[in-house]
Amino acid sequence: MHKIIIDTDPGVDDAIAILLALAAKDEIEVVGITTVNGNVGLHYTTPNACKILTLAGRTDIPVYSGCAKPLEREPLSAEEVHGNDGLGGIGFPDVEKQPEEEFAVDFLVRKARELKGELVLVPIGPLTNLAKAIEKDPEFVNNVKEIVMMGGAEFKGNVTPTAEFNFWVDPEAAKIVFDAGFKKITMVGLDAIDNARMNPALRELLYQIDTPVSKFIYDITRVYVNESWRTEKDLGCRLCDVLAVSQLLDPSVCKVVDAYVDIETKGLCEGTSVVYRKGRYAHVQKVNCQVATYCDTKKFVEVMFGRMFPEYVEVAVQNA
């Protein structure tokens, strides 16, 4: 049983990733959700986390509001991808659930102490909260069991030719995290995510399943598909953050390589994750993470539908 904190900026794909983690209740215990500025501002990401938990019937899980801006930069966002509110602009109603009073960074530090050696962090937004936790508590790094994150890219970015959005929003925070010395980091970046797709057939299947959760996913991904069509003439969409949770559930979903990852914080390529693969570069001796390089699409779909809509997993895999 993985005891996890999801650090997130919901976000269309964040919402689906959270719902997947909640559906895998025999494998994952979500001990809390921390929010951060990213896809949209904190004034949306925190209520969005509360809305997702309400939809899933899991209002018992606490939400903690985190950093409203990057460490050293002004906030950036991606409303064109996620809608003006982060949840596809579908007008999801307000809910009664509210965030806790405790600051997300303090919660991260406290929970890592309480669950020393057990806690898995799943950051699927900018890494500002984690960087702050590292700065706050020298033992935080040692207390965390592992990190499975969505972020970065070895070869090609999505907001610049070289940078992925989460690292680009707060490169200083990403550098702090990769330099900190965590026991295990798995970086699920854009190289693997190319195959973590929801094609039109899978999206139609969600509509036909016709549950509140499946219809919610169908509705919020409309804006995702619109952006994919506008930029790539693709009628599907990549489920970036969902792949990180899938990889936690089944490490065979992605191929990974050992590497040393550094983050560029200045200049033309700021936000770029520079990946030195072990064995490719003779001078590289130190390894600080595993980098996902490829995703098996059918395995990804099997993990996602197998946990969320198990009675439809066979037809989903057939249409992947």
Describe the function of each predicted region.
Residues 1, 20-29, 168-170, 185-320:
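Conformational coupling and interaction surfaces
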Residues 2-8, 12-51, 85, 91-195, ...:
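Active-site histidine-anchored catalytic micro-motif
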Residues 40-44, 48, 71-72, 153-156, ...:
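Short, mixed-charge aromatic SLiMs
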Residues 46-114, 287-296, 300, 305-309, ...:
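Metal-dependent C-N hydrolase catalytic cores
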Residues 56-57, 137, 249:
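A broad structural signal for alpha-helix termini and local helix breaks/kinks
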Residues 63, 177, 245:
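A residue-level signal for conserved active-site and pocket-lining positions in enzyme catalytic cores
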Residues 68, 78, 84, 127, ...:
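Generic secondary-structure boundary/loop-capping signal
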